[in-house]
């Protein structure tokens, strides 16, 4: 297999470190958003077993995680069969200010879950708020909206990168 686990992690961490060297808050917001996807799904499922209104916030959290997947990984908009209305809605978040508002709104929804009962959904609320703050700082500092530069398949000029690009081309 051309792509093994060690090369994937090596490429992931190389992209992660190169993104943080750029000192652009939109990249920080994107990485926090990617982490929030996993937190939303995991903590949403973990809190769904409460016998109170927290169940509603757990379901909302899972849905938020799935929406953030499409916001932060726009490649999925091309390969997943989605309605044009949803795709257009997600494409509205391609700048710092819209993403700031999106994450602050998502965080506010999860902060509201604390009015019912304090649960681990507070972690999701904190991370949504942090992502919103990062995008707000990027907008205030007039930083260009950047997307992460990591490539799991490797550099395009390497053999692994060419194999990865070929696989993606065949999928599309």
Curated annotation (Swiss-Prot):
Compartments (UniProt record): Golgi apparatus membrane
| UniProt keyword Glycoprotein, yes or no | yes
Short name of one Pfam family: Cg6151-P
Annotated InterPro entries: TVP18/Ca-channel_flower
Q: Which GO terms describe its biological process?
A: vesicle-mediated transport
Q: Name the family the entry cites.
A: Belongs to the TVP18 family.
The UniProt function text for this chain reads: Golgi membrane protein involved in vesicular trafficking.
**UniProt-recorded name of the protein:** Golgi apparatus membrane protein TVP18
